[in-house]
């Protein structure tokens, strides 16, 4: 591994905050990559080259300034990664004074590089997982390269799989990492993938004796963490368990379940969908037109629409609706009569009640 100039500049920027003397970072060929003095960047530093080749600290004296090219009195320290010298850290000043700082800054630099490398590897794996998942959902037949990726990622293609979609708001990489660690502590073979800015995709490897309650508890735990992290509601939809070769079916089911979860504000398993299963199949054009056709002029009265929603929420109970809205029951009867007048529908006819419910379903879901 070689230290990249961009990372070297970031390290120098951090060093500047805690150390006032001149500092440089030099590559293993002796070229200065970054420093507190920009004029020295790109220059050759013979002392650093010796330091890199001999894998040892090199003290530069005033006398050395005349015989070694590009040096200033100070100290050069090798920076190690996995036992290899990847750069040289140089400090200008009296060696006895600056050596303690030099050792401290070198250790800090090595830790910084390790963290950067870990993040780089993590991001590489995330990109590879996302690419692999897209292939898995799109390929009609598994190609040799796909099978090779599966083997590299340790994915068992013979197991049954279940797709789970979680949707919220943008999470930080740290939040994603924490959620992934929590999930994989229970299901280590699962693929936990950031799926766009607002979604997480979980490719769940279904155990032989799956316990749905356990899976639901884990989904609720992740949603609870995500809600806290973003201060917004997080929805979750789960498809059915399928063979690995039929993963697209489970993904489409998870999409349907997620749409219902956004409305009901609770995690949804596709296998539990009943009326929603039919309603999610209706075309967008019909979904947009139907509320206008059914509710008509009632849509212009916000208080009236809130009353209708609350009435349905309480299963058409006059008493519970009036209590929830803090209004007299006669006021509620007046509003419902007004709704019947504007819509031409009646709350004592089953067909009209179903029609109005479906109109509200489409209206509320499509305005989210």
Curated annotation (Swiss-Prot):
Single GO biological process annotation from the record: positive regulation of DNA-templated transcription
InterPro entries for this protein: CdaR-like_regulators (IPR051448), CdaR_GGDEF (IPR041522), Diacid_rec (IPR008599), PucR_C-HTH_dom (IPR025736), PucR_C-HTH_sf (IPR042070)
Domain of life: Bacteria
Residue runs in coiled coils: none
One function term, GO molecular function aspect: DNA-binding transcription factor activity
Membrane-spanning intervals of the chain: none
Signal sequence region: none
Sequence similarity: Belongs to the CdaR family.
PANTHER family hit by this protein: CARBOHYDRATE DIACID REGULATOR (PTHR33744:SF16)
Protein name, as recorded: Uncharacterized protein YsfB
Protein's organism: Bacillus subtilis (strain 168)
């Amino acid at each position: 591994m070689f230290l990249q100039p961009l990372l070297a500049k970031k390290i120098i920027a951090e060093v500047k905050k805690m150390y006032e003397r001149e500092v440089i970072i030099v590559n293993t060929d002796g070229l200065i990559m970054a420093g507190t003095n920009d004029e020295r960047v790109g220059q050759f530093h013979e002392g650093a080259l010796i330091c890199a080749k001999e894998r040892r600290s090199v003290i530069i004296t005033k006398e050395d300034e005349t015989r070694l090219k590009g040096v200033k009195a100070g100290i050069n320290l090798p920076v190690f990664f996995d036992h290899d010298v990847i750069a040289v850290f140089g400090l200008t000043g009296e060696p006895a004074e600056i050596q303690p700082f030099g050792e401290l800054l070198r250790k800090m630099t090595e830790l910084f590089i390790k963290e950067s490398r870990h993040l780089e590897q993590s991001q590489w794996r995330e990109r590879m997982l996302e690419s692999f998942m897209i292939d898995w959902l799109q390929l009609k037949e598994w190609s040799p390269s796909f099978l090779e990726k599966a083997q590299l990622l340790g994915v068992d293609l013979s197991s049954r799989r279940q797709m789970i979609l979680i949707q919220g708001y943008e999470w930080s990489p740290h939040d994603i990492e924490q959620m992934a660690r929590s999930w994989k502590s229970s299901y280590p073979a699962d693929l936990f993938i950031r799926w766009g800015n607002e979604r997480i995709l979980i490719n769940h490897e279904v155990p032989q004796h799956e316990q749905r309650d356990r899976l639901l508890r884990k989904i609720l735990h992740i949603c609870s963490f995500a809600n806290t992290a973003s201060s917004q509601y997080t929805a979750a939809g789960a498809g059915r368990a399928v063979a690995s070769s039929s993963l697209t079916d489970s993904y489409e089911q998870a999409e349907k379940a997620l749409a219902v979860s956004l409305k009901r504000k609770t995690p949804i398993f596709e296998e539990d969908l009943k009326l929603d299963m039919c309603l999610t199949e209706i075309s967008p054009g019909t979904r947009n037109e139907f509320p206008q056709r059914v509710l008509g002029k009632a849509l212009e009265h916000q208080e009236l629409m809130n009353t209708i929603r609350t009435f349905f929420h309480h299963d058409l109970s006059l008493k519970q609706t009036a209590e929830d809205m803090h209004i007299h029951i006669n006021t509620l009867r007046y509003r419902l009569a007004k709704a019947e007048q504007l819509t031409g529908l009646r709350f004592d006819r089953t067909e009209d009640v179903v029609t109005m419910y479906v109109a509200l379903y489409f209206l509320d879901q499509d305005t989210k």
